[in-house]
């Protein structure tokens, strides 16, 4: 499966433009360009009530979770709670995850899910959008940033102003670690997809990619001049350090690489690192 990067994102059915709505949480279903319903949550910034934080009402983080995550997972909510100290946060469950419709394509058509969430965030009145993705979500934010450019016709409401990719792969079909071999079994085997559905609440599409989408490392050169931060753990059990280094090399001068003392994705990222990411995004998003 692949996507047609042309075409617009279908908006949520909620009326989002009221300033009052930006002060209260919202939960709704968005509709992607290919008709999938996406469970989505808006959390207003906590510093509306917290005088110690700088005012940045126009900044919103759009968080893309990892494979088998969803908006209600505790590790996703912890990320949200930290980022609300720097701006509003939109989270969503990728297709095939949680209460969202469809089936997971493990990073291919998920760019449409992210585009719908970014468009919704802008519709709520936020003028600066930082996308932050973890693991599979980290690959999605990279591909999304390359496909949805500020100057491209039809994509001006779905582009990111800053991009943070945490624990992302650089290339597809990597099986060099035991966790990735297990993941490939989940995705490619009927028995694995049953385990994923009933054990991890993740419904995976049975079809192979056709054509194979552009890989993260192939996408990165198309992100410039949008600021890019690549974050990776030195103890990541899924993707070794050659992955972030490949991404950083592809980014050149417009990318920044942080190698951190941690493992993989949302479960491993600490509050101090999330604070630094929040600071970086607030500055980089302009």
Task: Tell me what each language-model feature is.
Residues 33-53:
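A short loop-to-beta-strand scaffold at the N-terminal edge of the catalytic core in hydrolase folds
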Residues 80-101:
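Conserved alpha/beta-hydrolase
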Residues 120-181:
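Primarily recognizes the serine-hydrolase "nucleophile elbow" in alpha/beta-hydrolase
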Residues 67-80:
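The serine-hydrolase catalytic nucleophile loop
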Residues 67, 93-98, 169, 263:
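Short beta-to-alpha linker loops that shape the active-site pocket of alpha/beta-hydrolase fold enzymes
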Residues 7, 13-18, 24-28, 38, ...:
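The alpha/beta-hydrolase serine catalytic core
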């Amino acid at each position: 499966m692949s996507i047609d990067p042309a075409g617009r994102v279908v908006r949520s059915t909620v009326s989002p433009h009221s300033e009052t709505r930006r002060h209260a949480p919202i939960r709704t279903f968005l509709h992607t360009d290919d008709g999938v319903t996406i469970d989505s949550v808006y959390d207003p910034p906590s510093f509306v009530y917290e005088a110690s934080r700088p005012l940045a009402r126009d900044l919103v983080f759009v968080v893309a979770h990892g494979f088998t995550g969803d908006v209600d997972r505790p590790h996703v909510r912890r990320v949200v709670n930290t980022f609300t100290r720097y701006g509003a946060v939109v989270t969503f469950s990728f297709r095939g995850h949680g209460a969202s419709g469809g089936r997971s394509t493990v990073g291919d058509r998920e760019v449409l899910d992210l585009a719908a969430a970014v468009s919704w965030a802008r519709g709520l009145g936020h003028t600066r959008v930082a996308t932050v993705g973890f693991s599979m979500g980290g690959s999605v934010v990279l591909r999304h940033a390359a496909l949805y450019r500020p100057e491209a016709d039809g994509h001006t409401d779905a582009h990111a102003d800053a991009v943070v990719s945490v624990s992302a792969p650089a290339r597809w079909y990597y099986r060099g670690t035991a966790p990735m071999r297990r993941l490939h079994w989940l995705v490619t085997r009927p028995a694995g997809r049953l385990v994923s559905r009933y054990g991890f609440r993740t419904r995976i599409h049975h079809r192979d990619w056709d054509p194979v989408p552009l890989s993260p490392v192939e996408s990165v050169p198309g992100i410039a001049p949008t600021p890019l931060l690549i974050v990776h753990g030195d103890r990541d059990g899924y993707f070794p350090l050659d992955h972030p280094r490949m991404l950083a090399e592809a980014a050149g001068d417009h990318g920044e690489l942080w190698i951190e003392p941690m493992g993989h994705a949302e479960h491993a990222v600490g509050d101090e690192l999330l604070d630094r990411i929040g600071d970086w995004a607030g500055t980089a998003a302009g």
